[in-house]
Amino acid sequence: LPCAEVTFRTAAAEESIRVISEAYPEMLVGAGTVLSVDQVKKAVAAGAKFIVSPGFDEEVVKYCLDNNIPVTPGVCTPSDVQKGYKMGLDVLKFFPAEPSGGLSMIKAIAAPYTMMKFIPTGGINENNMEDYLKYDRILAIGGSWMVKSSLVKSGEFEKIKEMSKTAVARVKEIRG
């Protein structure tokens, strides 16, 4: 994978970011599900190169912008997108994508914000990724279908590796 987002949902997040960053220096490793400035600081100290949050927290966004840390806050309404626009952002996470109306909702929200690109997450999988990736306002997609917790728990890392390779190859095929 060229890029990985480690979620800050567990106590192992910081150490995971550190280990991945050291083992794979060519990989762009970031922290996701970041809810506070304190978590931003911990993630960056561990080696995170970008921050993603599930919602739009102006304090987190401002801290990241003030410290030159790439940040992608989550949005799912035009009001959220407007906040991002006013703060100078041009890429936003659309979350949760599928439960919030999917690609048709993104297209509706994106229409007045012609400068904005989106990274949808939440319900993206191998069956719907192509539709998202074909829309020119989608910068990237996020998904965890290739890293299911059941595979991690059972130690099926080769399967995870193969599923990840397949996903990356599919993105390259769709995007050219």
Set out the residue ranges of the language-model regions.
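Glycine-rich phosphate-binding active-site loops on the catalytic face of alpha/beta enzymes
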Residues: F50, P54-V60, K93-L103, R137-K159
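Anionic-ligand binding region
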Residues: P78-L92, G102-P112
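Generic hydrophobic/aromatic pocket-lining and core-packing "Φ" positions
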Residues: I17, V40, V61, V81, ...
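C-terminal helical cap(s) of enzyme catalytic domains, especially alpha/beta-barrels
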Residues: Y63-I69, S150-G176
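Glycine-enriched alpha-helix->loop->beta-strand junction motifs that scaffold or abut catalytic
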Residues: L1-P2, A23-M27, V44-I51, D66-T72, ...
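Glycine-rich, proline-tolerant flexible connector loops at the mouths of alpha/beta enzymes
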Residues: L1-Y24, W145-G155
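Catalytic beta/alpha-barrel core
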Residues: P2-T10, M27-L35, A48-F56, P70-T77, ...
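Catalytic cores of alpha/beta
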Residues: S36-A46, S79-M87, I124-L139
